[in-house]
Every structure is written in structure tokens, then in C-alpha cells.
């Protein structure tokens, strides 16, 4: 039988993954309102970087030493960068106000990219929770928050093409990739328990890359710097609140 810890991890991963549906729903509701999106991007980038640098990496260094932790961090960044190169995680954007069948065709490639990019997030969640339930909950919240503006940005152009059913199906399948990643994380921890501190640093590398490579350029594209900074400040406030409310 599965332990309560494993069940809790899988439920957290599933709930976090399914926040992709919220991103799609907001894209349908707000459509061309990008102010909400830019604040969300800033908030998402801030919360993921804060948890990576102030939670995951310090815990990894404390348990495994700085050299091993940095190597694992580099490997995490490198693997996601390679994955991003092989399957580019492109956010679809209208060109000159036109939407055509080429956009929908490209959407399938984006959907595939979303699934592959969500997989390591589930892995990060599982390893963090095994090390500390409080830390795991923080990571789950960070990933859930990150999913919303990311899916919003992906979905908004296709909403204009009136492909809502495709969007929800894509978001749902993408969300299921996180529990799948969590299962992989649990298997890794079960068979390689001594490596769990390194898995956390590895996961931090993945989260840092996602923030810097996807969220920051996405915000730059919308040219709303003040709203992006507002989102970052909100993330700091929420992060500090969560560290007080959620026990380690």
C-alpha cells in the first residue's frame, strides 16, 4: 500500500498541475487584458526564484555540501536547457492581428512542450516534500502559481481562434505531467535516498531556468515593467507570509 506521504505528494502534484486549467479559464475570460498577465508573470518568477535560492539550494548545500549541490544545480539547469532546445517551449503570439490554421498546427507542438516542461516540476515537488513536508508545500504552491500565467500566455492567442476545447484538453494533459513527474521523483527517492539533497538542488536548477528563460522574456515582450515589478514585490510578501504560516 502507498504511504500517506506518497499519497499526499501525488494529490499535491495533481492539484498543482490542474491549475493549468485556471490559466486557460482566465485567458478566455480576460482575453486581451494583459495587465493581469504581467503581474502574474512577475509574481510567478519571483516566487520560484525565492524558493529556489532560499529553500531548495540552502537545504541541499547543508545536507550534501556546496560542491555537490552546485554540480546538481548545474545539471538541473543544463538538462532543462537541453530539453528546451530539443522541444522549444514557445508561447503563441498573433502576428499582425491574424490567426490562422498555422497557429493551431503550432499549438500541438506547444502542447507537447508544455507536457515535457511540467514533468520536472512534479519531480521537484516530490523530492522537496520527502525532505520536508513544509518545503514540499511551498514548492507545490510556487509551481501552481507559475502554471497560471504561463498557461494564460500560451492560451490567449488560441482563444481568439475559438479553440477553447483544444485549450482545456491541452491544459488538462499538461497538468497530468506533474503527477507523472512526482511518481518519477518518488521512485528516485525510494531507490536513491542518499541522493535526495542533490535532487533538490537539481530541481532548483530546473525552476531557475524556467523563471529566467521563459517568464522574464515573456514579461519583456509585453513592455509593462512597473506591473512586472509589482508582481515581484507581491511574491516577496506572499513568500514571507508562507514561510511563517507553513512549518518546516
Q: Could you say what each language-model-derived stretch is?
A:
Residues 1-248:
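Intrinsically disordered, metal-sensing/regulatory segments
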